[in-house]
Structure formats: structure tokens, C-alpha cells
A protein has these predicted regions:
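N-terminal Rossmann-like dinucleotide-binding module
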Residues: 24-90
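Glycine-rich nucleotide/cofactor/substrate-binding loop typically near the N-terminus or early
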Residues: 67-105, 110-111, 116, 123
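Beta-loop-alpha module in the N-terminal Rossmann-like domain of NAD(P)-dependent dehydrogenases
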Residues: 114-145
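ADP-ribose/adenylate-binding Rossmann-like module
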Residues: 134, 151-162
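Rossmann-fold NAD(P)-binding glycine/threonine-rich loop
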Residues: 141, 158-177
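Rossmann-fold dehydrogenase core element
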Residues: 168-186, 235-236
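Conserved anion/nucleotide-ligand pocket segment
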Residues: 194-203, 221-258
Length: 258
């Protein structure tokens, strides 16, 4: 079986909450219709991934609640988010922002911490899912902290795997944590894989050995609880959605170096 994927925009965590991705969604969050709100910590809440996640939380107030929000420097946006979503804790990496951030949320019973180390500790506070959306290597300490605590981490930070893949996956395996890709093509692969492993590749586009592409559907949305053997997937053909080579002529690709 071959999986063909082409995504032109970041789907982040949004499609995981969409009906078309119900199998993957239920694997990450459990049954969001159970009546018990899923607790989220959002690392990088003032960035693109964080804002997209909060938009879904706002649209589904009975399904999700915010335990902690973490940002880098934008204390004004973080304070506004905190007043709307009422987390128990918020963190700002920029220690100089601690004073104004505390003043902005005073009287709302929200614990405020500052500094990269303290923000990383917030990632270990028990929740259902930690959304890791901090950009670059700055996001690595909080990802490691979450996995060391056995958390389920919705990972939008590719740099964590590029720079410390063995450490990240090792911590997840050693402590019962889970890594869930939620950024762009990585999430697309995950969702297709979960659908394929559950009753025949739900809602994905597949191509057989002859290259013909066909749509398949399966209406079963029950959660997957076991690990899945990828041996049945022969090849993944992943087209780029952007990056530094987006406008490069095809004839120049042979000159690309690591």
C-alpha cells in the first residue's frame, strides 16, 4: 500500500478535532463526547499552533479545558488568553515580563511563573494532552519535561526530533509517554496511518501498485488502543508544502546539500 499526501497549509491540531480525523482524534484525546473535559497544557500559546488550538477550545468549551499556558515574550497576549480561558497556571520565558504579567491577571487565582526552567516544569503538570508548539530548540526542554512525566505530547516542534530524536523517543518509551505529530505533513501521515490501521484506511487516498488512486471510506470511529504495525505500508510519497526549495527549478535540485 502507498500513501499519497499533499497538504498546502499547516493542519496543526485542528484536523485532529475534525470529524474526518475521528480515529486519530480519539486515539489522542479519547472520547471527546464523554462529558469530561480534556485538560490541555499549551506550550507556545501565543504562536500559530497555540492560537489555532485555543480557537478550537473556545469553540468546544465542554470538551476541553486549559490547565496551563506558556509563552516566550508576548506577555500581553498571554494575559489576554489567560483571562479568557482561566488556566490554573501560566508561564513566560522572559523573566522581565513577570511583573506586568502578574499585574495583568491579578485577582483571578492564576499562578504565574517566569523563566525557561519554570516554564519547562509546567509541561510536567498532569494533563490529558500537552500541545508543544514552541518554535525551534527553545521548545526542547519543555518537551523533555513532559515526556519525562509520562505525558501525551501533541508535537508541533520538529526541531526536538531533529536535534534530540533518540532522547525524545527514549523518554517517551521509558516513562509511558506518547508522541503525537500535529504539524503539517507529519500529522497527515499519522492520521492516514491510524485510519489505515483501523478498518481499512478511513477517509484516506490510496494508490495501488498500478499507480491508480482511489478514495476509500469507513464510518467506524471507535478509538484505537493498541500499537499498530506499519509493515503493511510499502511506501510514503510526501510532497513538500513549502520550505526553502519551493521556488527552486527542478533542474537545480541536484545541487542541494544538507
Amino acid at each position: 500500500m502507498v500513501i499519497f499526501l499533499h497538504y498546502r497549509r499547516c493542519i496543526s491540531i485542528v484536523l485532529l478535532l475534525d470529524e474526518r480525523a475521528a480515529v486519530a482524534r480519539d486515539y489522542v484525546f479519547g472520547n471527546v463526547r464523554s462529558g469530561v473535559a480534556k485538560r490541555l497544557t499549551i506550550l507556545g500559546s501565543t504562536g500559530s499552533i497555540g492560537k489555532s488550538t485555543l480557537a478550537i477550545v473556545k469553540a468546544c468549551p465542554d470538551a476541553f479545558s486549559i490547565t496551563a499556558l506558556v509563552a516566550g515574550q508576548d506577555w500581553k497576549t498571554l494575559s489576554e488568553q489567560a483571562l479568557v480561558f482561566q488556566p490554573s497556571m501560566i508561564g513566560i520565558a522572559d523573566e522581565a515580563a513577570l511583573g506586568p504579567l502578574r499585574d495583568a491577571v491579578a485577582g483571578h487565582g492564576i499562578e504565574v511563573v517566569a523563566g525557561a526552567a519554570n516554564c519547562a516544569e509546567l509541561a510536567a503538570v498532569p494533563v490529558d494532552v500537552v500541545v508543544a508548539g514552541i518554535v525551534g530548540l527553545a521548545g526542547l526542554p519543555s518537551v523533555l519535561s513532559a515526556l519525562d512525566a509520562g505525558q501525551t505530547v501533541a508535537l508541533a516542534n520538529k526541531e526536538s526530533l531533529v536535534s534530540a530524536g533518540a532522547l525524545v523517543t527514549g523518554l517517551a518509551q521509558a516513562n509511558g509517554g506518547r508522541l503525537i505529530p500535529v504539524d503539517s505533513e507529519h500529522s497527515a501521515i499519522f492520521q492516514c496511518w491510524m485510519g489505515w490501521a483501523h478498518n481499512g484506511f478511513e477517509g484516506a487516498r490510496t494508490a495501488g501498485p498500478d499507480g491508480n488512486v482511489s478514495d476509500t471510506e469507513n464510518n467506524s470511529h471507535s478509538a484505537i488502543t493498541a500499537e499498530h504495525d506499519p509493515a503493511g505500508i510499502r511506501q510514503i510519497c510526501l510532497t513538500a508544502s513549502g520550505g526553502p526549495f519551493r521556488d527552486m527549478p527542478l533542474g537545480d535540485f541536484g545541487e542541494i546539500t544538507p
